[in-house]
């Protein structure tokens, strides 16, 4: 038996805003300096850049990056640069990624998510901060592992029920 093909409804802009705000609030939780804590804003931003590149672009990525920099008390622009580059990469390859299965998508977005961790890492090193260790980059791999779950959860409101009605023209 083959998997059903879902026809997605148009995305509600309020749902996009809600999901980005929820991801931002998850990043605000006091996780501490534990390695492997995912950057939820980067994950949700990457998802919407791939699925709705005309609604969520590099401007939103830059603004969210500035908010993350203010929250983390980092050099202003670290996350803004990382999120903008992540958004640019996602918008560039979004058509190819949408044709892949979720498992393959996970490996396709992994370099972008790890790259989004490398940018602030390199900026901090260039500004003279001590080397935080390679565990800092683990969160990019954790985000890639969360990609299938994030895709399923964020697409749920758009899915139409599979209805075996043979009299329907579409």
Predicted segments — roles?
Residues 1-170:
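Terminal, non-globular segments
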């Amino acid at each position: 038996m083959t998997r059903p093909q879902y026809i997605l409804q148009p995305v509600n802009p309020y749902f996009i805003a809600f999901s980005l705000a929820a991801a931002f609030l998850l990043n605000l939780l006091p996780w501490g300096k534990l390695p492997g804590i995912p950057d939820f804003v980067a994950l949700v931003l990457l998802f919407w850049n791939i699925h709705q590149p005309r609604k969520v672009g590099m401007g939103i990525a830059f603004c969210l990056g500035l908010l993350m920099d203010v929250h983390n008390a980092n050099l202003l622009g670290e996350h803004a640069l990382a999120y903008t580059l992540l958004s640019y990469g996602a918008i560039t390859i979004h058509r190819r990624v949408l044709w892949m299965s979720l498992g393959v998508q996970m490996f396709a977005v992994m370099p972008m998510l790890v790259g989004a961790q490398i940018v602030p890492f390199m900026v901090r090193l260039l500004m003279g901060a001590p080397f935080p260790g390679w565990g800092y980059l683990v969160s990019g791999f954790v985000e890639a592992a969360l990609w299938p779950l994030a895709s399923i959860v964020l697409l749920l409101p758009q899915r139409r029920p599979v209805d075996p009605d043979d009299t329907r023209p579409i």
